[in-house]
Amino acid sequence: MITKPDKNKTRQKRHIRVRNKISGTAERPRLNVFRSNKNIYAQVIDDVAGVTLVSASTLDSEVAGDNKTDQAKGVGELIAKRAIEKKITNVVFDRGGYLYHGRVQALAEAAREAGLKF
């Protein structure tokens, strides 16, 4: 019997491979994205200290949108605004093993337009 590979397990393996190569520092922290079926979460993380500096998600009341892609754009704008308030402008983008398409791409482009550099 042929079994289909679990999409989330392959994503996690891909994420581990990427995480072995990139790391966030205090000068250039990591912008991490996690996508669930209903929500999308973004965090700016300093991996050296092991601290989350800024976070935003669709669970925040400031994020509104008709569909998930619009909500992801709102999260991107919000994470960029909060990061710039803490004087963080340069980040390393960590797509979390997801394809750079759809909600992940919308979040990244909105964060870039709002002032984050990556």
Curated annotation (Swiss-Prot):
Entry GO CC: cytosolic large ribosomal subunit
Could you state a single Gene Ontology molecular function term? structural constituent of ribosome
Q: What are the recorded Gene Ontology BP terms?
A: translation
Q: Which domain of life is it from?
A: Bacteria
Member of which family? Belongs to the universal ribosomal protein uL18 family.
| Record text on subunit structure and interactions | Part of the 50S ribosomal subunit; part of the 5S rRNA/L5/L18/L25 subcomplex. Contacts the 5S and 23S rRNAs.
HAMAP family from the xrefs?
Answer: Ribosomal_uL18_B
| NCBIfam families registered for this protein in UniProt | L18_bact
Q: State the protein's name.
A: Large ribosomal subunit protein uL18
Q: Please name the source species.
A: Levilactobacillus brevis (strain ATCC 367 / BCRC 12310 / CIP 105137 / JCM 1170 / LMG 11437 / NCIMB 947 / NCTC 947)
